[in-house]
Amino acid sequence: MLDRDGFRPNVGIILLNQKNQVFWGKRIRTHSWQFPQGGIDRGETPEQAMFRELHEEVGLMPNHVRVVARTRDWLRYEVPDRYIRRDARGHYKGQKQIWYLLQLMGHDWDLNLRATDHPEFDAWRWNDYWVPLDVVVEFKRGVYEMALTELARFLPRGEQQRNRYLRSGMRPREAHETGPETYGAPGLHPARSGSFRVNPGMELPPGACFDPDPQSGQQQVLHPDPGKA
């Protein structure tokens, strides 16, 4: 289902844990990491599609989360031709998305990447709020920045201040330039002293594995389903 400009209606999900870190999933059998997302089926509202995708990709039910906010308007990105099936080229241009910010009300063990027989992710981790901008595939970076920026104002006040600090130049991609105690990989968190250290807390859902560094592999995103691109 495409609009007249060739964009497929889609929803994106930013899921927060109790530490206001975001869920980050590794697409199955690839080195590509992203937020949960998926197309809106005919007859669905964006919120209905969001809850369906939440269950299909992460295994969570509506009672596991609280809807904090959503973006006001559609956010669009174009998908390069090399990532589009040949039979869709010339018709499919990209995605237009409504993004939802959700708070996890349950526990890590409620997440299940094998909730359906067509899983989207085979590993996951919690990251600081802005870290995904450093590792998401290039053509999605703009829409990720728009969504994260618009929804950041709904974070708790203290977390807003902390994220402004991280966003202003101390994001993990750049941290290796600041001294011997800094780090460069996603999923690490600042120590109170001002240096950076590994956060050892990581729980995996059923059937998942853990890739400790999503930046270690080349991003290869081949999408048989345009709704996931």
Curated annotation (Swiss-Prot):
Cofactor: a divalent metal cation
InterPro entries hit by this protein: Nudix_hydrolase (IPR020476), NUDIX_hydrolase-like_dom_sf (IPR015797), NUDIX_hydrolase_CS (IPR020084), NUDIX_hydrolase_dom (IPR000086), RppH (IPR022927)
Keyword Hydrolase: yes
Keywords per UniProt: Hydrolase
Highest classification ranks of the organism: Bacteria, Pseudomonadati, Pseudomonadota, Betaproteobacteria, Burkholderiales
The name this protein goes by in its record: RNA pyrophosphohydrolase
Annotated spans, Disordered: 168-229
Positions of the Nudix hydrolase domain: 6-149
Source species of the chain: Delftia acidovorans (strain DSM 14801 / SPH-1)
Superkingdom of this protein's organism: Bacteria
PANTHER family, A to Z: ADP-RIBOSE PYROPHOSPHATASE (PTHR43736), DIHYDRONEOPTERIN TRIPHOSPHATE DIPHOSPHATASE (PTHR43736:SF1)
UniProt-listed Enzyme Commission number(s): 3.6.1.-
Biological role stated in the UniProt entry: Accelerates the degradation of transcripts by removing pyrophosphate from the 5'-end of triphosphorylated RNA, leading to a more labile monophosphorylated state that can stimulate subsequent ribonuclease cleavage.
One term of GO molecular function: pyrophosphatase activity
Record motif Nudix box, residues: 38-59
Family assignment from sequence similarity: Belongs to the Nudix hydrolase family. RppH subfamily.
Entry keyword annotation includes Hydrolase: yes
PROSITE patterns from the UniProt entry: NUDIX (PS51462), NUDIX_BOX (PS00893)
